[in-house]
A protein has these predicted regions:
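C-terminal core of ALDH-fold dehydrogenases
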Residues: 11-26, 310-350
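Conserved small-domain helix->loop->beta segment predominantly found in fold-type I
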Residues: 262-320, 324-326, 346-352, 392
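PLP-dependent enzyme catalytic core of the Aspartate aminotransferase-like
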Residues: 120, 138, 253, 310, ...
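Short, well-ordered beta-strand elements within core beta-sheets of diverse protein domains
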Residues: 243-252, 299-307, 362-366
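N-terminal "arm"/small-domain region of PLP-dependent enzymes with the aminotransferase-like
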Residues: 2-54, 60-63
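Conserved N-terminal alpha-helix of the aminotransferase class I/II PLP-enzyme fold
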Residues: 35-84, 89, 105-112
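A common structural junction motif
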Residues: 231-232, 319-329, 380-389
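Conserved PLP-enzyme active-site core in the AAT-like
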Residues: 2, 18, 74-273, 278, ...
Length: 392
């Protein structure tokens, strides 16, 4: 049987780089070399300079390509490096259509950087396919999706957007950071470029900064590789190894965290101090049916809204287990405040249009015991002053 005959959870451990061919080592070797000797003037090897490629980076790139069902993977120094390099496929005068509630770093890249180079943009609610259709312009070249979106967990109908894109000869990019190929495989649904902040669930231990891109079309892969090599924001070999190590436990981490996320979302929904919960695993989430159709789970990230910033401050000071920090997707639960963290680059009026209020918190659930997390949040919520609890 070939590697592709196994389920993804088995492929995470038993892939093409299960053992080193020259030594039998069961861990991918870390090749700390900036340059590579060529055996003769007329016989150059596969590798020449480490910006262009290394055996360790190749192992990660080939592994993520296989997991996503693509033909080529590319590893970058961060998630934003991967996204920025993908946007280099655009030229002056092109237009990109972007999901409205997008990660703050992507928002900044589009509004403050791409616009300086004559690349136009429009933000639309991609949970509404009619808005997507209406947002298409004659110069639209890329439709950029996040699903679930960050931080309000909006769900986009991937196949619906892909169909619109094909009708207008557009490429589709999708940030798959929240779900990973363990729960969602966008290339199988027709997406052209899948992007990841591998800093998050793929590596899973808050100890590496990394980005990945995967494509199915070989010509597009060649174009992206040329941009990767030219732009130069590549991933170092030590970090490649850390991501490869993290991938081995992706399935078990994500399964555990997703189950706890559902339990916490259900608990938070019933607590009187919580105004609203955003989690696509809840049956009353507006995108729940689409999520079940295109993904095998709802993931381990949820958001919830309290009365105001004062309530947020009290809760953050009151919980014990989650770390209060930027980022997500780690073994430890991470509580974040989008208004001052992931979406700090977004003006307040733009945030509020997207439902990112001063009372919104995002929780990336870790692998702790679910009952312990529930008890921790309960005691913190129960201690909120009456004036900070929604009275409606």
């Amino acid at each position: 049987m070939t590697t592709h005959d196994w389920t993804l959870e088995t492929q995470l451990v038993h892939n093409a780089f299960k053992t080193d061919r020259s030594t039998g080592a069961v861990s991918v070797p870390i090749q700390h070399a900036s340059t590579f000797h060529q055996s003769s003037f007329d016989d150059f090897g596969q590798y020449d300079y480490s910006r262009s490629g290394t055996p360790t980076r190749q192992a990660l790139e080939d592994t993520i390509a296989a997991l996503e069902g693509g033909t080529r993977g590319l590893a970058f120094a961060s998630g934003m490096a991967a996204i920025s390099t993908a946007f280099l496929l655009l030229s002056k005068g092109d237009h990109v259509l972007v999901t409205r509630d997008v990660y703050g770093g992507t928002f900044r890249m589009i509004t403050q950087v791409l616009s300086r180079f004559g690349i136009e943009h429009t933000f639309v609610d991609m949970t509404n396919l009619n808005e997507v259709k209406q947002g298409i312009q004659s110069n639209t070249k890329v439709i950029y999706m996040e699903t679930p979106s960050n931080p309000t967990l909006g769900i986009t109908d991937i196949e619906g957007v892909v169909q619109i894109a094909k009708e207008h000869d557009c490429l589709t990019f999708l940030d798959n950071t929240f779900l990973t190929p363990a729960l969602q495989r966008p290339l199988d649904l027709g997406v052209d470029v899948v992007l990841h902040s591998a800093t998050k669930f793929l590596s899973g231990h808050s100890d590496v900064l990394s980005g990945l891109a995967v494509v199915k079309d070989e010509k597009l892969g060649d174009e992206l590789y040329s941009l990767q090599n030219s732009f130069g924001a590549v991933l170092g070999v030590q970090d490649c190894w850390l991501v490869l190590r993290g991938l081995k436990t992706l399935q078990v981490r994500l399964e555990k965290a997703s189950q706890t996320a559902l339990e916490l979302a259900s608990f938070l929904k019933e607590h009187p101090a919580v105004k609203k919960v955003y989690y696509p695993g809840l049956n009353d989430h507006p995108g729940a049916d689409i999520q079940r159709k295109q993904a095998s789970g709802a993931g381990a990230v949820l958001s919830f809204e309290l009365e105001n910033q004062a309530a947020v401050k009290e809760l953050v000071d009151g919980v014990t287990l989650p770390v209060f920090a930027v980022s997500l997707g780690a073994v430890e639960s991470i509580l974040s405040y989008p208004a001052k963290m992931s979406h700090a680059a977004m003006p307040k009026e733009e945030r509020e249009k997207r439902g990112i209020t001063d009372g919104l918190l995002r929780l990336s659930v870790g692998v702790e015991n679910g009952e312990d997390l529930k008890r921790d949040f309960k005691q913190a919520l129960d201690q909120l002053k009456p004036a900070l609890v929604n009275q409606s």
